[in-house]
A protein has these predicted regions:
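Bacterial Sec-dependent N-terminal signal peptides
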Residues: 1-29
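Residue-level recognition of tetratricopeptide repeat
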Residues: 123-124, 158
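Alpha-helical solenoid repeat scaffolds, predominantly canonical TPR units
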Residues: 106, 113, 146-150
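N-terminal alpha-helical interaction modules that lie
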Residues: 24-107, 168-236
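TPR/TPR-like (Sel1-like) alpha-helical repeat modules
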Residues: 136-159
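A conserved position within tetratricopeptide repeats
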Residues: 115-118, 152
């Protein structure tokens, strides 16, 4: 009963997030990676990856939820896909954002670090959030709207895959870092524990105290595990 109550609370939150994007679709649906791979690698497909990426980079307001899903999960089949998150620009961005007040040069530095991260990972939510912070402070409405649309595409792709309440209904992500980055969007904070379930491609993050009473959120990291395994193992 307790699990059901928590699930209903989270579904209430997610329904507000996803209603406009997924009103005509099944509420949650795990990604079909085999189908996505066929679609994004076929030049005759409406989901051909270069076309989707161009739409995303130009922040096309007409990009559909299915296109967003293919864009995000189809990235694992692109040469630039690297599931690890070890860029030095993460540190530079964190340092720039840690200031109590910002100068115009600070804003420039934040944007430079964010753009550098997005070159390595176009779906880096931390970088997108950092750009939104700067554009809001600069009252740059057009730039803010563009980045906000990009962030929404990434968020919808992730939260449309499950409810995160169990290992059977996890959120799917293509980078472990995206787990942490999606938590604030869901109304959560990280509680300090990150555990991969034995013999599985699912892990969970424990949560800080929250109004839903949820203790942990589950994520499927199969793209990460598969990529690392195919390259001889290593850090995820």
């Amino acid at each position: 009963m307790k699990h059901i109550q928590k699930t209903l609370l989270v579904l209430t939150l997610l329904s507000g997030i996803l209603f406009s994007a997924h009103a005509q679709e099944e509420f949650f649906k795990a990604p079909d990676f085999a189908q996505i791979k066929r679609d994004v690698t076929s030049s005759s497909s409406s989901y051909y990856y270069p076309t989707l990426l161009e739409k995303y980079m130009t922040s096309d307001a007409m990009m559909t939820p299915q296109e967003g899903r293919h864009l995000y999960f189809g990235y694992v089949y692109q040469p630039g896909y690297v599931p690890t998150d070890t860029s030095s620009h993460n540190t530079l961005l964190a340092e720039a954002l840690s200031r109590k007040s910002f100068t115009p040069q600070d804003y420039t530095n934040i944007l430079q670090s964010a753009d550098a991260l997005l070159l390595e990972d176009p779906f880096n939510l931390r970088a997108l959030n950092a750009k939104l912070l700067v554009y809001a402070q600069q009252n740059n409405t057009e730039a803010y709207k563009k980045v906000a649309r990009q962030r929404r595409i990434v968020q919808d792709a992730i939260v449309g895959t499950g409810d995160g309440m169990s290992e059977k209904t996890p959120f799917y992500v293509i980078k472990v870092a995206h787990e942490y980055d999606i938590l604030p969007f869901l109304g959560y904070t990280f509680g300090g524990e990150d555990k991969i379930l034995k013999g599985n491609k699912v892990n969970y993050l424990s949560l800080g105290e929250n109004r839903f009473g949820v203790e942990r959120v589950y994520f499927n990291i199969s793209p990460v595990v598969d990529h690392v395994s195919s390259h001889g193992g290593g850090k995820m």
